[in-house]
């Protein structure tokens, strides 16, 4: 079976020195530690600096991103890319569907309206075992995957801006 992870692109000259924002939901600390490690490794390898903001849950991620983008712009230090990290585990109520769908929709709305490269690393799973398989950098590395997606979109944005 093919490796499901996005490949790391090696030519990072056009994005080196860019600034990224990671917003993580700390609902499951151990899982978030693993996802954050994967995302940070990808950003560092690509030559980006980054800030991390922590929020209580996945639904708070889009609002925190919007607030941070506005503040960074106001201070003359805009972010070039954003990575959202979180974990939503299915329970016995429809809360899972609401959190999963609304956080994803809000992130897509932000990416499109703000024209910001955004990697969605909010994993949605049925079990803790599935969460761990997706969080660990040695397995599916969804934190790293979200960072690679944001980096790929940043490359596209910069190439198209050049004309």
UniProtKB/Swiss-Prot annotation:
The active site is at 95 (proton donor). It is an enzyme of class 2 (transferase). GO terms for cellular component: cytosol; riboflavin synthase complex. It comes from the Bacteria. Keywords: Riboflavin biosynthesis, Transferase. InterPro entries: LS (IPR034964), LS/RS (IPR002180), LS/RS_sf (IPR036467). Signal peptide: none annotated. It catalyses: (2S)-2-hydroxy-3-oxobutyl phosphate + 5-amino-6-(D-ribitylamino)uracil = 6,7-dimethyl-8-(1-D-ribityl)lumazine + phosphate + 2 H2O + H(+). Catalyzes the formation of 6,7-dimethyl-8-ribityllumazine by condensation of 5-amino-6-(D-ribitylamino)uracil with 3,4-dihydroxy-2-butanone 4-phosphate. This is the penultimate step in the biosynthesis of riboflavin. This is 6,7-dimethyl-8-ribityllumazine synthase.
